[in-house]
Each structure stands twice: as C-alpha cells, then as structure tokens.
C-alpha cells in the first residue's frame, strides 16, 4: 500500500502475471505494469524492485507519476531500500550474497558471502535465512556485516521484526517462533491468543 492505493499482482490466462493498483475505496483499478514484479520495498511515494524482463537492475516506481525508472545498475534480487540512497540486496552474481550500497556513492559492499534465501532489515541488524544443503540456519549480522550470530539451525521463512521480537516460521512444521530483539537466541513457540 502506498498512499491511498493497494498494489497487487494480478493473474489471468491471457497476460499471465501483471501489476495492478486499486484505491482503498475499491475504485480506480488500473494496470501499472505488464511485467511481473516478484518482490519490492516501499519508501514514501516509491516502491523498489529488481528487473524481471531484461536485467536484474534496481528499479524505482513513482506512485505519483506512475513511472518506473532504473536507478542502479546491478544484478539484484529482493532489494530493501531503507533510506533515500541506502539499499540492501541479494547479489545474483555472488550466489545471493547480501550486499549494501549507497546509490549516490556507488560503493557496493558484500556484508556476508552466505547464500541467502530471504532476509529482513530492522534498525542496525539484518536477520536472514542462510541457504545450505548441509547447514541451513537463521542468522543475524549488524548492518555493517559484523557480529555474526546463528540463531537457529534449519530452514525458516517469514522473518518479521517488531521493536522487541523477531518472528519466523519453521519451514517443515509451519510452527511460528519468536526471539527477543534485545538478546536474540532462545526460541519460543508463538501461540497467538484469541481476541475477545
């Protein structure tokens, strides 16, 4: 959601997957792009995604002008833009290693050479699922690449972070767990209560 519009992927047999938007009042439904956008990150009036048709560069969509513009030349996947020029992405050319760059300075820095399935950035930490056939794990590092810590062995998905907890789902059992953001380590099964 950006402003008063919800952006979503639409599928039909004629055009396959395309990007649409609709107003929060249910009006103003319109196609935004013929191209499939797998993941994106929002900041202000913009959302950011990697290219999916001709390249893997970083693109910025302006929700005011309805224009998509290439803003950074790389081969990225799952970009997260956390500031005007501050970008994290998985570098496809480095087997999905996590990279940070400042777009205006154009000095990409590899934060970890682990092959990464998914990640989330919160404050000064990055939480990620390390891909490995032998040693997959949920891990964390500072946003400068230091202070590596393995939180849990195995395969996890849906990494979501709040001010005091990190939530994630065991891929096999579908059990949701959480751990503290202030002292991550001990995993606790999450059992949501029933609203009364």
Please identify what each model-predicted range represents.
Residues 1, 11, 24, 41-42, ...:
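Generic beta-strand structural signal
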Residues 1-3, 34-44, 73-84, 113-123, ...:
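Repeated scaffold domains used in trafficking and secretory/extracellular systems
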Residues 7-9, 47-50, 88-90, 127-129, ...:
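Residue position within the beta-strands of beta-propeller blades
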Residues 14-21, 53-60, 94-100, 133-139, ...:
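Structural motif
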Residues 23-27, 61-66, 101-106, 142-146, ...:
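Short loop/turn segments that connect beta-strands within beta-propeller blades
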Residues 27-33, 66-72, 106-112, 146-152, ...:
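A short beta-strand motif characteristic of beta-propeller blades
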Residues 33, 40-43, 47-59, 70-72, ...:
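Solenoidal tandem-repeat scaffolds enriched in leucines and small polar residues
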Residues 133-137, 142-196:
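Hydrophilic extracytoplasmic domains
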């Amino acid at each position: 959601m950006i402003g008063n519009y919800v952006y979503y992927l639409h599928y039909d047999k004629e055009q396959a997957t395309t990007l649409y938007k609709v107003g929060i009042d249910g009006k103003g439904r319109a196609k935004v792009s013929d191209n499939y956008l797998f993941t994106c990150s929002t900041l202000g009036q913009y959302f950011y995604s990697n290219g999916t048709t001709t390249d893997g560069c970083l693109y910025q969509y302006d929700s005011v002008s309805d224009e998509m513009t290439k803003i950074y030349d790389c081969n990225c996947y799952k970009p997260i833009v956390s500031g005007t020029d501050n970008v994290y992405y998985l570098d496809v050319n480095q087997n999905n290693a996590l990279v940070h760059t400042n777009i205006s300075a154009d000095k990409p820095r590899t934060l970890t050479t682990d092959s990464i399935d998914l990640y989330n950035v919160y404050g000064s930490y990055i939480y990620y699922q390390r891909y490995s056939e032998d040693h997959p794990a949920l891990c964390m590092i500072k946003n400068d690449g230091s202070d590596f810590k393995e939180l849990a062995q195995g395969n996890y998905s849906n990494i979501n972070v709040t001010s005091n907890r990190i939530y994630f789902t065991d891929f096999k059992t579908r059990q949701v767990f959480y751990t503290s953001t202030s002292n991550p380590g001990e995993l606790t099964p999450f059992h949501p209560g029933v609203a009364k």
